[in-house]
Each structure stands twice: as structure tokens, then as C-alpha cells.
């Protein structure tokens, strides 16, 4: 359900070839976590001269980090750079009798800044306040 991108195309095709089914949400979340850890390790090692990073170095590298994933751009923007936001999609399901599977139809995509509160604002307060500052396309 993620938007078309080179990273998503690579992931979707590889996953489908290896498993015989298309990837679902859990596979996307795991790839996102692994790619985030990879980005943090690379950032920490670039800063410390190429050594294996410590936990503190990884935490510092992950703070405010952004990276591309099959599900879109992940941004550590909330909670002082310790909570991720990302784009999201909603859809309906429809049975496909030819392929004997359920397909996603009528997919709508929303930017991360459209469905997450601005930094420093609690989600419930943001919703009650009419989602002020939401950046929707």
C-alpha cells in the first residue's frame, strides 16, 4: 500500500519473489527498523572514525535522523527527535476472484505532517484543537 518509489519497488519485488506473496505491514515495519538501525550505525561510525558504535553513540545518531524506507521517508521528529513519523495510507479491500486474493483499492495517501501533531504538541490536544498546523496535500 506504500507509494511507488525505487526503494518500495525493490522491497516489494524481492519480498514477493522470496515468499510468493506480497509484503504486508509487519514486513514493512521490520524493514523500516533495520534500515533505520543501518542509517544510525553508519552515521555514528562516520562520526567516531569507523569504530563499532556504543549504545550512546547510536542513540545520538538516531536522534533527529531521517531515512528512506519501502514505506516512505521516516523522520525522527517528535519527542525531541526520539519518535518517528511517516506517511500513511488508507484503503478498502476487495476480493479479486481471478487471483483468488484480497486486493487493496481506493488507496489514499497522507503526508506524515498531515496525520501527526507538530513537535511539542500532544496528539489528543492537537485533535481536540482541530489539528492546527496539519500539512495536508
Where in the sequence are the language-model features?
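Extracytosolic ligand-binding ectodomains
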Residues: 1-137
Amino acid at each position: 500500500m506504500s507509494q511507488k518509489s525505487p526503494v518500495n519497488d525493490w522491497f516489494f519485488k524481492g519480498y514477493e519473489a522470496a515468499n510468493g506473496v506480497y509484503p504486508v505491514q509487519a514486513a514493512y515495519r521490520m524493514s523500516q527498523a533495520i534500515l533505520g538501525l543501518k542509517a544510525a550505525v553508519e552515521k555514528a561510525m562516520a562520526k567516531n572514525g569507523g569504530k563499532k558504535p556504543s549504545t550512546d553513540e547510536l542513540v545520538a545518531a538516531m536522534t533527529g535522523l531521517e531515512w528512506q524506507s519501502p514505506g516512505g521517508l521516516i523522520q525522527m521528529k517528535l519527542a525531541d527527535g526520539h519518535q518517528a513519523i511517516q506517511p500513511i495510507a488508507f484503503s478498502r479491500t476487495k476480493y479479486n476472484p481471478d487471483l483468488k486474493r484480497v486486493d487493496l483499492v481506493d488507496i489514499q495517501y497522507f503526508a506524515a505532517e498531515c496525520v501527526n501533531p507538530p513537535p511539542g504538541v500532544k496528539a489528543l490536544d492537537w485533535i481536540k484543537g482541530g489539528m492546527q498546523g496539519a500539512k495536508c496535500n
